[in-house]
């Protein structure tokens, strides 16, 4: 529900009138969201597969060290991602969704990081003239919370993909297709002020040792 609320808050900043629908997997039932909430507000893919949408957000999941094919609902996610190519004008792949999308559509493998990239980082814009960055400076700040990465060279090797922004550590932050119908975003512009602190507490309770305190003073 937290991610749902954060994304709705971001979408509400647009002057456009947006009608939002929520989608859940049928092959896996979430253990972190109240079942009654899902039943009341969420659809399954079979319920919406004949509709067409202007946009879709495929969100993240705490699956950093799990290979894509070992994700319990991977087959269903693949079916949905394939469907987006004909039924959604623009698809926004966020965090784990970005790595899932890059792997499914372009065969780009996600890599495990020895230490979680966790905190607020500076980003270099590679495509300054893009409408995506209208009003931005050459660098911008955004949170990251992930132990997964891709080789930037693997993304750059795909003719249909453009690297739009990278982190101060040289990691992919934003990429898109040349027709702007697919976006792949590894940072979290939707996060609230306390989200990183809450995620740190969650990771500590899990006994994770590869997580340091979140970075709050970017190096650039």
PLM feature spans:
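Amide-donor transfer/coupling interface in amidating biosynthetic enzymes
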Residues: 1-27, 43, 48, 52, ...
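Short, glycine/acidic-enriched capping/hinge loops at junctions between secondary-structure elements
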Residues: 2-6, 32-35, 69
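N-terminal beta-loop-helix "entrance" segment that forms/cooperates
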Residues: 26-39
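Short catalytic/ligand-binding loop motif for oxyanion handling, primarily in non-cytosolic enzymes
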Residues: 30, 64-67, 100-103, 151-153, ...
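Extended catalytic core of nucleotide-activated donor transferases of GT-like folds
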Residues: 42-49, 66-72
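Cysteine-nucleophile active-site neighborhood
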Residues: 58-127
């Amino acid at each position: 529900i937290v991610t749902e609320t954060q994304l709705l808050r971001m979408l509400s900043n647009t002057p456009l009138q947006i009608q939002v629908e929520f989608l859940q997997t049928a092959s896996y039932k979430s253990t972190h969201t109240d079942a009654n909430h899902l039943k009341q507000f969420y659809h399954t893919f079979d319920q919406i597969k004949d509709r067409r949408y202007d946009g879709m957000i495929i969100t993240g999941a705490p699956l950093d060290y799990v290979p894509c094919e070992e994700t319990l609902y991977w087959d269903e996610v693949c079916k949905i991602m394939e469907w987006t190519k004909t039924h959604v004008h623009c698809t926004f792949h966020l965090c784990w969704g970005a790595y899932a999308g890059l792997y499914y559509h372009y065969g780009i493998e996600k890599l495990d990081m020895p230490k979680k990239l966790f905190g607020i980082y500076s980003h270099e814009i590679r495509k300054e003239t893009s409408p995506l960055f209208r009003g931005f400076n050459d660098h911008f700040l955004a949170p990251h919370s992930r132990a997964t990465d891709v080789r930037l060279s693997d993304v750059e090797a795909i003719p249909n993909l453009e690297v739009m922004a990278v982190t101060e550590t040289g990691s992919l932050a934003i990429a898109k297709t040349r027709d702007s119908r697919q976006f792949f975003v590894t940072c979290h512009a939707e996060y609230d002020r306390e989200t990183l602190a809450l995620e740190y507490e969650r990771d500590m309770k899990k006994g994770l040792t590869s997580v340091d305190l979140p970075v709050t003073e970017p190096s650039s």
